Amino acid sequence: MKTRFAALAVALLVSAPVLAQSTAEPPDPILEAGKINARLAIEYMKREQLQAAQEKIDKALLQNPRDLSVQLAAGVVFERLQDTKRAEKHFRQALRTDAKSPEAQNALGAFLCRHGDHKKGEEMFLKAAANPVYRTPEVSYTNAGVCARSAGALERAEKYLRQALAVKSVYPETFVQLAGVMHDRGNHLQARAFIERFLATAPATADVLLLGHQIEMALKDRAAATALSERLRKEFPGSVQLRVLDDLERRNTG
């Protein structure tokens, strides 16, 4: 299953909060335009209209360079454009804009982990988790677990993920990550239990069904493995995960 980080900058930017105006003083139209252009840049990026995304984020940075959401959007867009130096610059600038922002800490942590600096990435996630203004520390603990797992540090990954469950006992993303870690560590019965907990609390995904199939095969429960593979074929017929499954089955029968 591919490495992924929970609840990061794109989702935050698309639904950026609007603060109530406390006085008659109107918002600066140029600053507001910068925020709007940052959100538009993310929308264009999601549609793979990358030139338009770059044009919008360049405008946003000219209009409102001191805004946290603008800097986070710039980091996301430039990383998608494979300009990692500019992306890192903007993720770090977001943190300088608000050193206590858990969103900025999470975004920089994810960037560092994606680009191989697992130690510093984990440190940023743990800072976010310990941030007293952060309402969802389970997200950062889960992200720290993903980061540690991608570095091959499975024991540390399990520790972070169990910290996430200690904060919030029902968080599906933590369940699936723990299933992966337990499977990697050879503890397939516990891995199965976490897949079951995920499927009891969230809709199935192609990743989860494929991982569940692999776990059941490791447990030599062919009936359970077949049930999950049939679900994958029925619910996600055009998925990459189904192609992976087909390749695995060809190798097993070849």
Where are the regions a protein language model picked out?
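Canonical tetratricopeptide repeat
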Residues: 39, 72-73, 107, 141-143, ...
